[in-house]
């Protein structure tokens, strides 16, 4: 633990004050651990938010001082007829074009910076979305092909590690500041955890676009297929966070641990080398983990200070990427005006 923590550049722990906006809860994947996906026949499902609904949420986020608009949606949601119908009603042929305009609206009509996470995208779609996103992201989750034959991923073609690695690689080729990470406790082995972290390190070494690596622990909840699955132990998380920090010790890549999934143990992970809490919202729930509420910002500050660190707010895009090598003029001007 001490060895991992000593590689810190400073005593700062960062977070991004965001709003979490699910544009649709429809998804082609059906992961055994998922709390996000809903089916079209579910009366509570978000089929597709309107621009007016999104803008109202963004304006509320502005009042709370948020700087990041996190747009999430199920992978290839526009393959579902109900989403297709909504898109056609709104005048669109596909969800990427719609998301592009949502992000453009965010830049033009609010003070927030868009960060899109919608699963795998083609090279062409990533290239388009790069123009209106300060950063993007997608969890690698695991490089284990074996998990494709287990309850975790056997109904989720988009979780094929080859496809996900290609998406993250294409983001690097396009110089998109990118957030990724791994999910532990879904049936992977320690060797597969190591392989997943090494794959992310390889992509960072090749393209330099990985700005943070999330170490996320599976948490069970009622109603999911893996409801009775055993969660990873505290020691599993400690080992993985330390391994991640040591693997990226010679870089400025942040190691992130979600505080809402580790309320009673979060401070320990700071001592293991984690240096980022990720996005924390004062205005919206964590739709991916709805049974795990965010800590308040006051609570987050107390947790951080009590562990001997200083909490500071950051943008969704890390400072090192705020230049014309990574961002276009529109985004750079937007960020300059926010400073």
From Swiss-Prot:
The gene is cofG. Residues 13-258 form the Radical SAM core domain. GO terms for molecular function: 4 iron, 4 sulfur cluster binding; 7,8-didemethyl-8-hydroxy-5-deazariboflavin synthase activity; iron ion binding; transferase activity, transferring alkyl or aryl (other than methyl) groups. InterPro entries: Aldolase_TIM, CofG_family, Elp3/MiaA/NifB-like_rSAM, F420, rSAM. [4Fe-4S] cluster binds at residues 27, 31, 34. It comes from Methanobrevibacter smithii (strain ATCC 35061 / DSM 861 / OCM 144 / PS). Belongs to the radical SAM superfamily. CofG family. Pfam families: Radical_SAM. Catalyzes the radical-mediated synthesis of 7,8-didemethyl-8-hydroxy-5-deazariboflavin from 5-amino-5-(4-hydroxybenzyl)-6-(D-ribitylimino)-5,6-dihydrouracil. SUPFAM superfamilies: Radical SAM enzymes. Signal peptide: none annotated. Its cofactor is [4Fe-4S] cluster. Consists of two subunits, CofG and CofH. Keywords: 4Fe-4S, Iron, Iron-sulfur, Lyase, Metal-binding, S-adenosyl-L-methionine. This is 7,8-didemethyl-8-hydroxy-5-deazariboflavin synthase. NCBIfam families: F420_cofG, PRK06245.1. HAMAP family: FO_synth_sub1. Binds 1 [4Fe-4S] cluster. The cluster is coordinated with 3 cysteines and an exchangeable S-adenosyl-L-methionine. Its EC number is 4.3.1.32. It catalyses: 5-amino-5-(4-hydroxybenzyl)-6-(D-ribitylimino)-5,6-dihydrouracil + S-adenosyl-L-methionine = 7,8-didemethyl-8-hydroxy-5-deazariboflavin + 5'-deoxyadenosine + L-methionine + NH4(+) + H(+). Pathway: Cofactor biosynthesis; coenzyme F0 biosynthesis.
């Amino acid at each position: 633990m001490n060895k991992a923590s000593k590689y810190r550049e400073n005593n700062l722990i960062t977070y991004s004050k965001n709003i979490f906006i699910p544009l649709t809860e429809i998804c082609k994947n059906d992961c055994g651990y998922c709390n996000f996906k809903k089916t079209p026949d579910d009366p509570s499902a978000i089929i597709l938010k309107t621009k007016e609904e999104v803008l109202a949420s963004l304006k509320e986020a502005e009042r709370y001082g948020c700087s990041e608009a996190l747009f999430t949606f199920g992978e290839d949601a526009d393959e579902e007829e109900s989403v297709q119908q909504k898109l056609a009603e709104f005048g669109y042929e596909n969800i990427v074009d719609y998301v592009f305009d949502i992000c453009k609206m965010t830049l033009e009509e609010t003070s927030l910076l868009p960060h899109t996470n919608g699963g795998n995208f083609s090279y062409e779609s990533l290239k388009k979305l790069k123009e209106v996103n300060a950063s993007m992201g997608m969890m690698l989750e695991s490089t284990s092909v074996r998990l494709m034959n287990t309850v975790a991923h056997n109904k989720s073609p988009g979780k094929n590690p080859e496809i996900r690695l290609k998406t993250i690689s294409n983001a690097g080729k396009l110089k998109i500041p990118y957030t990724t990470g791994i999910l532990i406790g879904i049936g992977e082995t320690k060797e597969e955890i190591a392989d997943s972290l090494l794959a992310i390190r390889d992509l960072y070494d090749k393209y330099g676009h990985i700005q943070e690596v999330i170490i996320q622990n599976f948490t069970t909840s009622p109603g999911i297929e893996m409801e009775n699955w055993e969660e990873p132990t505290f020691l599993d998380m400690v080992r993985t966070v330390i391994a991640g920090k040591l693997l990226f010790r010679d870089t400025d890549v942040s190691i992130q641990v979600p505080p809402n999934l580790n309320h009673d143990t979060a401070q320990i992970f700071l001592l293991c080398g984690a240096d980022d809490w990720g996005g924390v919202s004062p205005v919206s729930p964590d739709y991916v983990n709805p049974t795990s509420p965010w800590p308040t910002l006051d609570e987050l500050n107390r947790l951080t200070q009590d562990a001997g660190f200083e909490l500071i707010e950051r943008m969704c895009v890390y400072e090192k990427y705020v230049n014309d090598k990574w961002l276009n003029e529109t985004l750079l001007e937007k960020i300059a005006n926010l400073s």
